[in-house]
Amino acid sequence: MSKEKFERTKPHVNVGTIGHVDHGKTTLTAAITTVLAKTYGGAARAFNQIDNAPEEKARGITINTSHVEYDTPTRHYAHVDCPGHADYVKNMITGAAQMDGAILVVAATDGPMPQTREHILLGRQVGVPYIIVFLNKCDMVDDEELLELVEMEVRELLSQYDFPGDDTPIVRGSALKALEGDAEWEAKILELAGFLDSYIPEPERAIDKPFLLPIEDVFSISGRGTVVTGRVERGIIKVGEEVEIVGIKETQKSTCTGVEMFRKLLDEGRAGENVGVLLRGIKREEIERGQVLAKPGTIKPHTKFESEVYILSKDEGGRHTPFFKGYRPQFYFRTTDVTGTIELPEGVEMVMPGDNIKMVVTLIHPIAMDDGLRFAIREGGRTVGAGVVAKVLS
């Protein structure tokens, strides 16, 4: 079978299902692909094709994730669904599946449950910007008042974590009935798809964001000056533009006097490309791996931040023993390790392998960072955890 050519004519948006175990996330994922395929074309995916999610590795952590795709008339969606709660935690913290928006599935028969709350909190911490609610199993609830009560509880829970609970779209449906082809419930899936289109704004593409390049290597070329190499994370760098060198040391300014790729000279380097950038007036020893080149004024160096962290279990190759306050591992940001100290939440004495935990980290050197930046926690080069900057403090 020949591979279909990928038509990139429509905007691409990343979404995923979140919510409590057995509330119907995977059934809903199957229903969306099935109903949209029937209505707009595309491939339907059966429940069992999605449920036996393959393993993948992200930052040294094994995660089971299913990826499906579907189309509405205006957009192309990539959708992630995870079989187990631990997979969600790992997925969201590592950013293995960056979500532009999430579909929170809540069974009308149960209402919000512990993992409902936990996934909303995680969404807030890791920067999922939009949540749409699918109230599932509504075919099993006859009482209109009960549905209204559950809806109210969900809205309150969202508001508690700073999502706009009162304005969040809530669709009442039945994923199973829609999957079985019941027209009344299929319409609810189309209603949900409509909200995906209207409520989640089109994400800003990496190339449209301000320029940033994590420095991997530094060379000096006699007669030309200092060259830094790395993969452009976002934006575009053009010859002649000013840049800042941020992190580890005092921030310095320079001008890009050349961009090259595979030994060819270019006018610009774009997001996703591996390039060398020639810098004016910078000595080889004034710059090092772990710093970033950035558009002036767009990113600052910080040492202290609040984070959400997942600690690998022993089976995942992590630590065999818990750690306590006073733990001083390395935090690997982009291209380099920086030692840091941790503060655990009130009342938490120790952290076990396999836990996810909120912690405040203080680094010994400043690193260029914004909220949402991912990092690994390492001990002597071995990954023992993964985290995300929830909030820069200083």
From Swiss-Prot:
Annotated region G3: where? 81-84
Identify the Pfam families for this entry.
GTP_EFTU, GTP_EFTU_D2, GTP_EFTU_D3
From the UniProt entry, list the residue stretches annotated as the region G2: 60-64
Reaction equations catalysed:
GTP + H2O = GDP + phosphate + H(+)
Top-rank taxon, per record:
Bacteria
Presence of the UniProt keyword Nucleotide-binding in the record: yes
Residue span of region G5: 174-176
Name the HAMAP family for this protein: EF_Tu_B
* Protein family membership: Belongs to the TRAFAC class translation factor GTPase superfamily. Classic translation factor GTPase family. EF-Tu/EF-1A subfamily.
**Name under which the protein is recorded:** Elongation factor Tu 2
Q: Which gene encodes it?
A: tuf2
